[in-house]
Amino acid sequence: MKKTFIFLTMLLIWIETSFAQTNPAITAWIQNHDGTTGRHYVANNPTPIDDGILANVQSVDYSDNWVYVSATGIPSYITGPFLDNNPSLATDQQAIYKISLNPTQNTGTATNTTGGNIGVFVNGVSLFDYRDGVRWDNNYNRLCGGPGNPSCSGGPQANRDWNRDAIPAEMGGFDCNKAHPAMGNYHHHQNPSAFDLDLLVVSDVCDTYPADGLYVIDVNEHSPLIGFTYDGFPIYGAYAYKNTDGTGGITRMKSSYSLRNITTRVNGPYVGQVFTIQNGPNAGNQQVMDLGYFREDYEYIDNSEPDYLDEHNGRFAVTPDYPEGVYAYYATVDENHNSAYPYVVGPTFYGNVTGADVNTINENTTNYNSNLSVNEHPENILDLKIYPNPNQDFVAIQSNLLDKKLQLQLVNELGQVVLESEILSGSTLNILETHTLYNGIYFLKVSYEKQQKSYKIIINK
């Protein structure tokens, strides 16, 4: 009897552990086990400043129905500066994200996305939808809401026909990671990869203030799982299997939204109208309200091709993390890898919205420690992009999204270690300064847990 009891107890523990290790909503989070802290730039100073705040996710706890993700909202990649006179910095949100482990499709009227948090990325950074809170007030023929604009007539909750899209309107205020803070809440509206990695670079902020974003687009690999929304469904990066059954090779996931063919907007400004900001730090600046300036400039066009997404910006398909298939959203980009509306989720959710940022955990939970997990890492974890090579003054080392640190050693031909560094968990980039080294052949030794790999690097000044 005693042996039977012990066996049953061990079986229950094994079942519980197996559940945690096979549910990506529990295992996908980038936990901070090494004390990594956030860093930020300020304008006119390209040297990062340490925040002194723990980065990434601090704790993951789960029950039968929920996972609770405790995070500061601070990434390990360098944030800032925000060059549109945004006075805010990324600050500790002390957040606890409650996400369903059993998400369900909403079979009734779809729920609109809202301003503020609608999900969370795997590093604990908030996800916002397209909007920035600025709208067109047709009663006064002006923009309303947001910094520097008058309040909207009827109050902040009044519906408006034309709601501004943050991506074109606030381009100058995004940092290299394509993100910015709202009253300290650092967040992404769009695909969270760095501007300078796009095929057509639309912002030069990375030239002075380099950072790496959450992940690197690889056109030959299925993009990683990068977050979860408040309806409990996962978010992937920009590329996936073409066909929903996992066949057809890798391709870019495409938005089914297109700009409408209009020159006027009913109860709104005409296309191309110029608006001058009247108040605030950007007073006197002008913005051209071209097509795409407002969310309502887009229309949904149904497409039966498997690599085109539905009206929520998702589809049901096989993914590396869900071999039986799952409904998932995708961070959509165009052919130049520039962000494409509706960016991640929206304008409505696919599922029933049950998630939230809560104050406390009010049920019994089990803690998940990724340091103790036995998850297998992808074989390409040490496949790096190294450029320029040959180099003169620096070499950039780009990795895929990491859940643990990547150790770097630069070794000369005598076997001497001349430089040591690392790529932090939740980060993808390291820049080694080589201007003090002699010309010659060097070897970059890369270590990830027990895996190792070497690359030849040439310095030629």
Identify the role of each PLM range.
Residues 19-20, 376-461:
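C-terminal outer-membrane/trafficking sorting elements
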Residues 132, 148, 156-209, 230-231, ...:
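Core of folded catalytic or high-affinity ligand/protein-binding domains
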Residues 365-381:
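Low-complexity, Pro/Thr/Ser/Gly/Ala-rich linker/spacer regions in secreted
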Residues 1-22, 374:
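Bacterial Sec-dependent N-terminal signal peptides
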Residues 231-233, 238, 242-355:
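Extended, compositionally biased non-globular segments
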Residues 21-175:
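Solvent-exposed N-terminal domain segments of exported/luminal and surface proteins
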Residues 122-125, 182-195, 322-338:
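Extracellular/lumenal glycan-associated surfaces
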Residues 69-115, 119-122, 192-244, 342-348, ...:
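A short, polar beta-strand/turn micro-motif
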